[in-house]
Amino acid sequence: MSDISQQMNNLSVQDNNKPNGNGYSGQPQQQSGRRQYVPPHLRNRSSHQPSSNGANGDIPFGGSRRSDYGGGRGGFGFGGGSNGGGSGPSGGYRNGGARGGSRGGFGGGRYQRPTPGVGRWVDGKHEPAPRNDRLELELFGVAEDTLFQSSGINFDNYDDIPVEASGEGVPEPINSFTAPPLDELLVENIKLSRFTKPTPVQKYSVPIVAAGRDLMACAQTGSGKTGGFLFPVLSESYMNGPAPIPESTGAFSSHKVYPTILVMAPTRELVSQIYDESKKFAYRSWVRPCVVYGGADIGNQIRQLDRGCDLLVATPGRLKDLLERGRVSLANIKYLVLDEADRMLDMGFEPQIRHIVQECDMPDVQDRQTLMFSATFPRDIQMLARDFLKDYIFLSVGRVGSTSENITQKVLYVEDEEKKSVILDLLNANSEGLTIVFTETKRMADNLADFLYDQGFPATAIHGDRSQYEREKALAAFKSGQAPILVATAVAARGLDIPNVSHVINYDLPSDIDDYVHRIGRTGRAGNVGIATAFFNRNNKNIVKGMLDLLTEANQEVPDFLNKIARESAFGRPGRGSSRGGGAGGFGGSRGGANRDFRRAGGASGSSSSGWGNSSSSGWGGSGNSGWGNSNGYSNGGGSYGGSRSSFNDNSSYGNPSSQNSWW
């Protein structure tokens, strides 16, 4: 980190012509003379061959030229690759077992050849499939391949993160991945993934789910939340098997799937990532993962579902569509997972989620286990839990809503007209590794990516107006290092876990401090170190108080201009900090109490760790069942958050979440 700090200290916003070790400079270059960035996992190979699917050194990145950039991922494609967003059949998760007694062939008693890597549930016992070297290479890579890395050099630091679990009868945490309590097959897959020890959220989630309890987990971004729900629900599924098909539907129906596990998340990138992880941990088991999301051909997704689906990862809009078409039944759901739950509500998905959970054929809250995971859980989201969870355990890991000390944060005062000059200096000074640049609008993302390309920097862009094919190509090119600079809107700000991201630049700062936290969380993940640089000016003074709190909490340097603007804002516009919970210090001193269990003391903060105050099992300090929608921090937001957060839909890449044509 000393070298990085030295580079930052030597940074000049005036010198645009400074060359670096990779030959980049502020002046335009011929692309043919540019040295291509080679990611760490490819550096020891004899040659770095680009993708054969259209991504090579001759294909440019900028503007319409960038639309041809990158290549589709073969094998286990990102979100299905060329299969249009389905759970691509090349992965070996085609048919597996069936919905009959022995799960030996799907639909109508047809005989189908066993699929490599897919086990069976026969006569009440789990029969794992034989190991398959080809699938293991595709799923887990090789030991030195950091594209599949699972831990960083500071991973042991997580042992010092404080954990607070509230609720009655909290089980003791685990300290290692062992069988028991985990299923033996899952432990083998975890070892293949090179996970050496559980993160704090995983230490608690495994015994909590094994005890049959519901869970609300609030943990730092990059702290292993995906494994926190996949590990326990898959382990329990391997040991207990699938539920029988409801008799009223016919045991051999080939037109509807009956998943055991449902995972809902807000964006297609996040569900695709969860699906990729689920394939690793479901390897050789009877559980067949599938993924569905908007923006891809629904016909292809239906065909993938018809081949069998036991774990369904979905965005709310596409799942609602498939339910209405009669292609998915939720009657057999044992485990419901809501990932990034706060963001799903922020984006207006509450009506769709309530319809799926409460109005379809999903088992009642008493007959399923529900897990809610996110980086933040403000009070309005916790209040929603009264309808979705029962007797749950609230888990708060670390300083929830704050940032990791593994991330070195730098805040630079940059006027809007100087931003392009400064970003060239930044990229010249820190040319190694992958860089994500965040903008507030789709137009700016394209404009900046074109500008960087014209200046000799291999950049690509993703946002909501890009087709799914273009987005998959851009992400694949970025992860492979062929385009080591990714310009993105908020579509990539949450949940995506891309290894080797060493630098995050907030070219445009968001209006919500929580969004800033999630953006910079794309680096410094799983114990690795990273740099986050923010371009700040007086147009961003609405979040200055929140930024001061974050920098102080993470022991980061606070520039003098930030303190000065904060004092000015305090006189001119008192009380404007974070847009949630009334700014910093609202409840429990963590921006609205995002890491507090509001069941304590009838919904008030600051209570002791023992007892539940005056709140009942279903009450929230006297709040009625319908009161939460208008009592949250989004005035006029109601259920869709449209009144006070209209700028979110205007400037983000999510589009209109209520539209049937949206990409969810």
Curated annotation (Swiss-Prot):
Cell location: Cytoplasm
Feature: compositional bias, Low complexity: 19-37, 606-618
Compositional bias segments (type: Gly residues): 69-110, 574-592
Limits of the Helicase ATP-binding domain: 206-395
Amino acid composition bias (Polar residues), ranges on this chain: 1-18, 648-664
Alphabetized UniProt keyword annotations: ATP-binding, Cytoplasm, Helicase, Hydrolase, Initiation factor, Nucleotide-binding, Protein biosynthesis, RNA-binding
Cited Pfam families: DEAD (PF00270), Helicase_C (PF00271)
Chemical reaction(s) catalysed: ATP + H2O = ADP + phosphate + H(+)
Gene Ontology MF terms in the entry: ATP binding; ATP hydrolysis activity; eukaryotic initiation factor 4G binding; G-quadruplex DNA binding; G-quadruplex RNA binding; mRNA binding; RNA helicase activity; RNA strand annealing activity
Principal EC category: hydrolase
Motif (Q motif): 175-203
GO BP terms: cytoplasmic translational initiation; negative regulation of cytoplasmic translational initiation in response to stress; positive regulation of formation of translation preinitiation complex; regulatory ncRNA-mediated gene silencing; spliceosomal complex disassembly
Domain Helicase C-terminal residue range list: 406-566
EC number: 3.6.4.13
Signal peptide: none
Keyword presence, RNA-binding: yes
Functional note: ATP-binding RNA helicase involved in translation initiation. Remodels RNA in response to ADP and ATP concentrations by facilitating disruption, but also formation of RNA duplexes.
Domain comment as written in the entry: The Q motif is unique to and characteristic of the DEAD box family of RNA helicases and controls ATP binding and hydrolysis.
Similarity remark: Belongs to the DEAD box helicase family. DDX3/DED1 subfamily.
This protein's name: ATP-dependent RNA helicase DED1
